[in-house]
Every structure is written in C-alpha cells, then in structure tokens.
Amino acid sequence: MANTLVGRKRIRKFFGKIREVAEMPNLIEVQKASYDQFLMVDEPEGGRPDEGLQSVFKSVFPISDFSSTALLEFVKYTFEAPKYDVDECRQRGITFAAPLKVTLRLIVFDVDPDTGAKSVKDIKEQDVYMGDMPLMTENGTFIVNGTERVIVSQMHRSPGVFFDHDKGKTHSSGKLLFAARIIPYRGSWLDVEFDAKDIVYARIDRKRKIPVTSLLFALGLDGEEILSTFYNRISYTRDGADWRVPYDAERLKGFKASTDLIDADSGEVVLEAGKKLTARSARQIAEKGVTALRATDEDLIGQYIAEDMVNYKTGEIYAEAGDEISEKLLKGLADVGIEEIPVLDIDHVNVGPYIRNTLAVDKNSNREGALFDIYRVMRPGEPPTLDTAEAMFHSLFFDAERYDLSAVGRVKMNMRLDLDAPDTMRTLRRDDMLAVVKALVDLRDGKGEIDDIDHLGNRRVRSVGELMENQYRLGLLRMERAIKERMSSVDIDTVMPQDLINAKPAAAAVREFFGSSQLSQFMDQTNPLSEVTHKRRLSALGPGGLTRERAGFEVRDVHPTHYGRICPIETPEGPNIGLINSLATFARVNKYGFIETPFRRVKNGVVTDEVVYLSAMEEARYYVAQASAAMDENRRLTEDLVVCRRAGEVIVVAPDRVDLMDVSPKQLVSVAAALIPFLENDDANRALMGSNMQRQAVPLVRADAPFVGTGMESVVARDSGAAIAARRSGIVDQVDATRIVIRATEETDPTKPGVDIYRLQKFQRSNQSTCITQKPLVRVGEQVGKGDIIADGPSTEFGELALGRNVLVAFMPWNGYNFEDSILLSERIVKDDVFTSIHIEEFEVMARDTKLGPEEITRDIPNVSEEALKNLDEAGIVYIGAEVHAGDILVGKITPKGESPMTPEEKLLRAIFGEKASDVRDTSLRVPPGVTGTIVEVRVFNRHGVDKDERAQAIEREEIERLAKDRDDEQAILDRNTYARLADVLVGQAPVAGPKGFKKDTVLTREGLADYPRSQWWQFAVVDDRLMTEIEAMQKQYDESKKRLEQRFLDKVEKLQRGDELPPGVMKMVKVFVAVKRKIQPGDKMAGRHGNKGVVSRIVPIEDMPFLEDGTHADIVLNPLGVPSRMNVGQILETHLGWAAAGLGRQVAQAVDAYLRSHDATPLREQMRRIYSEAELDGLSDQDLAEIGNNLRRGVPMATPVFNGAKEADIEAMLEMAGLDRSGQSTLYDGRTGEPFDRKVTVGYIYMLKLHHLVDDKIHARSIGPYSLVTQQPLGGKAQFGGQRFGEMEVWALEAYGAAYTLQEMLTVKSDDVAGRTKVYEAIVRGDDTFEAGIPESFNVLVKEMRSLGLNVELISSKRAANDQLEAPPEAAE
C-alpha cells in the first residue's frame, strides 16, 4: 500500500462551475494579525516601527518632573518567556501571559540658577518590570484565569469629518438643517450646524452653541478676512450717474433679468428684461467683447460691503465689512466722494449670506472676546484670563497630547475636503476648520452631497490590538501622574528608574480590560464553527460604540457596501439584530481598520488572475461584475451587456467598461452561511436561523461529515484548530490515542529538533461543557506532508467539519407526532448512539483555613455509611472511572463547627468519654441533582508548603512518567537520526584513530561499525579535515540537543512539584470532572442547516417506522407542511442529492467488494470515473482506490458551494446515475400495518444537528429548597434549585374556579408562611393531613415597609376586638 494516503481519505464530488482564483485568507487572521502587530514580540531589524505598544510608550514618555530637572526616557521593551504554557494555565486557573520588561533611562540635569541653562549631570538606565502582558494562543484566544476568552472586534464610526442634515425633523416647516461634525480618535468633538434662521453655529463637545464666526475669530481671523475667505468680491465703479460692474459669464449663467441688461461701454441692450441668460447666450455676449454692464443705485441697495471703508487721514469709518447697503449709506458714501464700492458676491440663489449674517449676530468682533466666550462655555463659573483662555483653546484642538485625529481620521479628512495635510498631522489646523465650514455652507447652497454614515467607508473596525493599545495608554497615563509626583518628592540624584515606577495602574488596566470589558467575552466553544464565528464577530456595541436602545433601523440594516465585507445573513435574532455581524469569508481588515474584499482585475473585457483587495471607498469608483459573469475559454466576457455594481447601484455596461470582477460567489456570506448547501434556494430569514443554529450543534460521539456539503468544511476544521495539521512534513514514527510522533524529513536547520510530538486532547471540557477529544488519522510509517490533517478533533471527520449526522428522512405526517415542527425519531437512532453526545461537568471544592480551624479533605466523614464512601480512595477523593449519581460524594470534606453551649447531659458524656465526638460537620462535595456520569479526571492543587496527600502524589508521578516518555522518545529519534548521519560519514573511510581495539587505517563498513557501541563512534578520527569538522559540528549539536531536552524535562518537573498559587485562605483545591452521556430523548431540540428546527416528540420502535421496498426503515419523519410557508426549499434539494449520494455509495461498495474478490480494479475504476473527474483519481494505485472506495460505502460526499452549486438537472442526473427515480420520491410502507401509503413520499438523506438545548439541562423539580431572605418565598430558577412561580394570573384562575383552599395553600404554606410550612412538613411526616395556614411573611414585610414610611399599622385579632367592645364605656363605643 502507498504511504502517502493522508489528505486523500475522502474526495468530494464538486459541483461548482466557477473556478476559485483567490486563496481564502486564514479565518482567524483578524485576531492574530492585529495582536501580533500590537505586541511585536520579536524586535525587527532596525528597531520597532512606531505602532502598537511601541507607540503607546513613545506617546507617554519622556516624563519630566515639574521643575524640569529630571527626565525619564523610554528606550525599548522586551518580553520574557511566559512562566506557564497554555495547558498549565488552563489547569491552574491562571492567565497565559509574558512578563514585560521596559528599559528606562533617567537623566538628571544641573540647572544654572542665573542663566537657566541645563547640563546633564547623571544618566541611569535600568530594566523595569511592568506587569504581565496576556499572550494570544495559536487559535486566536486568550487564557484569562484559566478560561478561554475572545476579544470581539468593534465597529465604530471612523474618525474624520461628517456632513449630515436633520431630515427636516427639527423645525416644523420641514426645512433641512445641515450640520458638520469633526470626530477625532480621542479629544473634543466639534460640531458646526445651521439653525432655522440660517445662522451658522459651532458647538464643542455638545455644549452650548456659539456663532461659528467666534470660533474663526479665536483662530486669529478678523471680520474682513472671514468674509474674503467665504465670498468673492465684485467692484462697482462710479460711471456718471450709474455704476459699472464687470461682466462674468460664469456667474450670470441662468440669471433672469428684471430690467434690460445694458453694455456699460456702448450702451446697447445685451439682454431684454424678463429673459433668462442661458449658458450659450452668456458665452456669446462675452465673445462680442462686452466687459462691463451698467448698474443703477437700485442694483446696489441690499448688497453687502466687502471691506471696511475708512478715511485713513481722519480715521473716520464710513462702513464696516458686511454692512448692508441702504439708500442712506449710499448717499453718505457719495457725499464723501467714494467712487468705487467693493461688494460681496451674494446672489441669494447660488451663494447665500449665511456667514455674513452670522457675523452680524455675533457679539464678538475680536479674538479676545471670542476666546473668553469659548472659555465660558467650556468651563462655566471660572473667571477667564487671556492666558488661561488661550491655553484652554489650544489644548482643545491643537495639542497632540489631548487631541488625536489618528492616521485614519487625517486620511478621511483629506479625502473629504481635498486637503493635502500629511498623515502625521494628527491635530486640527486652521485650514481644516475653514474647509469644514466652507463645505457646510456649500451644502446649504446646494453643492455637494451629505455623507452616508452607514457606508463602510465611514465605519471602521477596532480589533484586539487597537482596543488593547487604547486600554494600555489609559493605564500608562494614570501611571504618569504618579511618576511626576514621585520625581518631585524623592532625592532625584540617588534614585533608580525602578524606584519611580509603580506598574500597578498599567497592569490593572490590562486586567480590567480582559476581565470585565464588554468586548472580552467568554468564548463560545460549543463546536469548532462557533469558535471561528466568535473570533470573526463584529460588534457595534461596547465602550465608545452604540447602545441597543439608541440604535435605530438604519444602523442595523444591510448596506450595499456590506457586499463581500459583512455577511447580510448571519446576525442574532432579537434586540441585537444588525448590531452584531460576521465578517464575510474573503474579507480582511486593512491597516486603517477598514474592511477590504478581493476582486479580479478585468482589462479590455478580459478577466485576469490578478487579485486586488479594496475597501468600500476605493471600490465606489469601479464597475464590478459578478463572479458568475459568462466568459469564454480565453476568459473574455461574452455577454453584450454585463450586469455590474457601481457605488451601490446595479447597472448594465459593455464588457470593455468593466474594471473588476468578484473572486467567488461565496464572498458575500460569512463562514456559517457558506456551510449551508443550496443557500440560494432558502428564504433569508430561515438562512439566518440556519447559520445561527449550526453554531449550537453539540459534538456527537461519532462525527459524520455531511453527504451534501459546500466544500468549506475542511477550511473550517483546519483554521479553527480543532483538527491537528502537521507542522512539517515527515514520517509517522509512533501513534497512540494520546499522541502522534512524526520524524521530520525535510528539516535542514540543525538547531531545530528533528521530531514533532503532537499531544492529543482527551475528554477535555470546553467552555460550554461539551467534550473536546481528538483522535489520530495516520498510521505508523505513513508519509505526511506539511499542513496535512493528522488528527480529528471534536465535530470533525477526516479533517472536515462534521456537526451532525446524515439520517434517512421521510417527509410525511405521522399520527400527529410531527405537528407544529415536532420531530419523530426511530429507536435505531437511540440504540446505535447516532445522536449521543458526551458532556463534561466540572465540580470543585476548596479546603479553607477557617477561624475555628482548617477544613480537611478526608474519607472520615461523620454519620455517613460505608456504602456512600465506596467510590472514595483513602484520601477522600473519588476514583477515576467510578460511576456516580445525584447525591453521591465526590470529595469528602469536614469543617470545624462553632462551639455551642453544652447541655448537662452532654457535659456528663464529655466527662465520661473525654473529647467531644462530633465537633465537625460534613461539607462534602456531592453530585448535584440531575447529573449521572463517569469520573474522567481528578486534579488536586496544594498550597505552597502544604504536604501532598497520596492522591496528589500519584497524579504527579503519572504526569512525570508521561513527560519522561516524551523525552525518551524524542531522545531515541535524535539518537537514531544523528548516528545514521554519522555512519554515512564514517563508512568507507579509513580512520587514523578510533576506540580501544581498533586497528588504524582499517576501512570501516557498516558491519564493522556495529561491533562498537554507538557512543564510541565519536572517537574515530579521519584524515580529511573537512569531514572531521563536520563530525565535530555534529557531535556538538547532538550534545546541545540532548542538554536542551533534559533541561526542558527538568523545568516541567520542577513546575509540577512546586506548590500551586491558590486564592488566599485556601489550603487545598480538588477539581473533579464527570463525563455525562446524553442520548437523544423527547424534548431535545434538533435542526437541519436550513433553519428547519423542531423538538423531538416521540421515539418510535423501529418496526413501527415507515419503510422502503427493500425493508430499510426511515430514521426520522418530518412534516412536509413545515416547508412551503417557510420557503426553505434547500432542505428538499439536499434530501434529493443526499439520496443520490447514498445510492452511488451502494454502487461503489459493490464494486469494491468485487475488486476484493477478483483483484480486478477495472470495474471499480469505471464506477469512480463516472462520479469524479479524471484528475482527482490519476496516480492512485488500485489499493488506494479501493481504500477510498471503502470510505464511500455509506454515501459519496458531494460539495455544492453557495450560489455556485448543483442545479435541478444535476440532481436528476445524479439520481439517474444511482439508478433511482428522477423524482426523488419512493413508495413507503406503514410499519404497523405493512400497507403502502397512498402516495409516493420524498425520501432521502438530510443532515441533522442536535442543538445545545437539551431537555436534561432544562427539566427541574423542587420539593424543599432555599428561600429568599427577606420575603421568605422560594427562590426561582434551576440554578438556585427554585420553585415555579404562582403569579397574579394563576391566582385569578384559582379564584375563577372558586378553589379557595387550594388558593390558600398556594399563598401560605406552599410559599412564605414560615411557621405553617414547618407544621405541614411535620404533619406529613406523622401521616396526619390537617394543618392550619398562618400569616404569610410577605404581609409582615408590607407592614414593616409601611412603618418605615411613618404609618404605624397594628393587627387586631377578632377575639380581642370583641372583648374591647364589651369593656369600653358607652361614650367611647360611640
């Protein structure tokens, strides 16, 4: 048999017509790349670039003290090796992190008291420990306090400038009020907005508004400059009694003349009154040589003066810039002999007087007043001085410490406003603010468009690295304050950097982020798909994001720019819909945080293989064809008109205008949606449910890849890290259930070990208590290539994702048992463990040191029978492999009791028998109700300095043996490889020296070498210097490798023997893991991949299930009425194709059996050729072919990729090839009567999942249990072992039936009548059935509440009231 079968254990029949060009990026690249870029653990050549952690340190350091006599500089940072590896952290419940060491330099200056000149007095450098920095595991997760967590990426509004209007909601007239907002990455927001009167206002940080001109004054402009910035000017020159005004064809285009337009020079009428000046006529007038028109005084009235009109000799001001020209002003100007009046070019149509009007209403007219105004808005109640006001204004927008646009913000701003500031300019400039106001005024004038804030060019992704960077910066800033204070208070000449720094704030910021941030989530680890999806999730919630309540419909909706970037299907149902999304399959995040998707370039109508990644902004200007556009064999687009997307619209263009083309039809959906075959035939709502429910599928005992898949299964299995891929190519040396040893064959680097040991996980508990277990796929001696799958994990089979099982389905009603989506199952499913899953529950108990003495873990428990202790060892801990049930003891523990006053009898007994017998109580760890299972693992943790018990020592010995075995195996392979290389060098040589007994100059042969022990081979010396050098190098490397192996082993053993870090006051901790086997049962939830979910209603004996002509019974019966209204027809197509797959599988099985009998592979090859293409089978030997055929017995797996899969005709062809009816329907017989059903029934194989909503986890009953402290009513919920609430409506029901006594018990003895319920219990124990209800505790609570409000409420019992009446004097009674 050939040895390279790995990776070909299963071949899928592929239906896709469209060739895939682009490689799908690694699915968890988003997480890994982001965090790697933040940490940059290995310093690149030439130092680290200024990003990530480096930029954080650079931005906070250097720190100087208040008197500038000392400076603390940042030099570099390094990471040390983490103290524990990932598995140790998981077991010990600690964080997987590496110590961060920062090199700091303290420079002390001498300051000359007279001149103030500084000279360096002392420089000290030191490495300072700055806390531990969590590291990411291979799979893109973090281990925090022993649990796996994922940091979800956040979608937020990109920094930059945005223009918007209020959609006419603010003002009753429905007028659009435009607004601009500059959003920095951190710092103050600046809003510029119009009000209903068209005055422009500015707001800083959503505070009180000020006229925008005040802001411009504060920037250093004066009124005239402001007007000249926003308006052009026109000069009116006196010409006799009238005025001359220059003629500008562009400006007057579209102008309607109210009076005749007259040429100022010739006096001719160029345009008659009432006519409109078209672009053509305006141009013709200019061509005639008209340069100026005649204007009258009336034309000037109502215009605005463009500059201050001043008599420079006398200083008299005739008019200020912005003044409106009135008859009086015009007359006044004429009187002083002014011949030329500059006016602002405002025509109230194309250019509005908004800035001029704002200037007119602004109380301020200079910089000082404006600064004071801004100061009063920002800090009300503080008296401003010019210095403080200036400093405050500067710090708002121009101080890099406080204001950061970020590179993204700067790029976006430059693009939107056509500016050319460099990326490094992270603060605002005067030009930026002016450009924003200008753009806003242009919008009001009807030029330009507002921004769409849901466009993916305006939303960006913050991944782990960036979130962490912001958090760490906050921590360092807190630290900076403390450092400054400490620098001032200590003797700076004698201290080292270490003494100035307290790293707690920085470490606390990190801890807080990973422990309690909204974006740091407990990983969804139900199955490999749910892990991958969780890491690819994008959330709009979280700090700095939206809140559920505030998010409107637009934010949640699907946007055209989502195409290929965010999945339109996968999002939760419920309040988070649309706020939590998933990245599309090919999407990636670029350095600016925008999501990019790949396209193929199209040149002159020919599609190339060049792939480009574009963000939503870049894509907008191209014509993009679909991946399914028709091409000929030269890849030329064949259709006359191609359907394309451009800027969110769908249009039809000629092939030569197409710029780009999608790389794959599945690039618009997420990973989960891409796993649904025939997605294109499902309604979107059901596809959403299908995507979400695949993530809840429980890993089953036997994984079974789907007959009808999409080809994505292997990608998910590999990238999720569930299945193990070979790190290097090599030959399998050893295999057992717990590890695989591979000898690397292509390793040339002598410093690396020549062997890879892969440890397989066995029965580990996931975050969701599902079972993680891996099993090998390779055999000893097989050749393995790099990246080949060598072991399956949970929910994977042959390296493919396998979330459920293929079952034979019949779509028909069956006695009402599949009414309303219920599911009817055959008993075979239970008997053959088809849907059986293993769940691992973890229980832990701690022995603490209490005030009354230490708790003790022991087998010696008071008042417990020997029967109850049968599963415990001598240390009081349960054995591995024991079967336990609810209430069984897992770990025996006793706690000292408090001293209680002794009765005389006790004193007597104590005097007779000495020490009191039971001063301890039993606080053992017991199995909670509803759990039955097998103990699979026990871990014992001891505090430093506490003696280990026998159990802990046994566990430690086992672990050390396992480590020693690994070391010995690696050593053996090292020996074998090294000595084989040494033999190759020595054989054929005639050494001049050798070990004892060797005659020199004898030519060595392999047999001759074998006479000497291998360790003596190094003693041979040959003449050839080159060979000698090689042998010496080999020996040195061999010794080093041996030493390394031994050291690694000793380190691990030392860690094992060291005490554990336990919480304060805990002496010992025991964790017990129980494996629970859950068979499927009525009440469990199941689903297909198309959103077809239901609850198991009944499990029917096999003989009663409907059966086919050949006697095969259906496994599952679904209701056909669940299909039409839900419009998820994909499940029917899947059923048909699954039926064909099973039919073909039977044919292949027959051919394989024939081959095994006759050893003639021709019929088998023919059969396989009918199914697969030639290329897939080429080069396979007969034996390999038979092995692959053997894997196809149950069914031939197919792949039908989304939007590119099998069509109806393909399915029919497959059914025909399998010798089945083209309709996909069969005659079924009733299992109970043996009669055929009236009509043919759709029968086939469908892929069903068992979801993580198991009836065992939900069903619950209570008799006696805990009560709430205040109200004394039973608690609610399964976790609290609570009762069922009998609420207001239930009381109405009992009232309606007049069930008075039942109602009374419900409200008293079954709830919160404390004395009554005790009496009932005693009565039931006595066998008595009479009891009396008392006063419910909640009534007392009500009375107390009323008393607390000052109303004294007292109860008067009826007997006492009657007596009082009798004894009272007559007047009192009245």
UniProtKB/Swiss-Prot annotation:
Statement: the UniProt record of this protein carries the keyword Cell inner membrane: no
- In short, the EC number is 2.7.7.6
Which keywords describe this protein according to UniProt? DNA-directed RNA polymerase, Nucleotidyltransferase, Transcription, Transferase
* Swiss-Prot/TrEMBL catalytic activity: RNA(n) + a ribonucleoside 5'-triphosphate = RNA(n+1) + diphosphate
Biological process, per Gene Ontology: DNA-templated transcription
Write down the superkingdom of origin.
Answer: Bacteria
PANTHER family in the record, alphabetically?
DNA-DIRECTED RNA POLYMERASE I SUBUNIT 2
Q: Which family does it belong to?
A: Belongs to the RNA polymerase beta chain family.
Subunit text: The RNAP catalytic core consists of 2 alpha, 1 beta, 1 beta' and 1 omega subunit. When a sigma factor is associated with the core the holoenzyme is formed, which can initiate transcription.
Supply the name of the protein: DNA-directed RNA polymerase subunit beta
Task: Please give the organism.
Answer: Methylobacterium nodulans (strain LMG 21967 / CNCM I-2342 / ORS 2060)
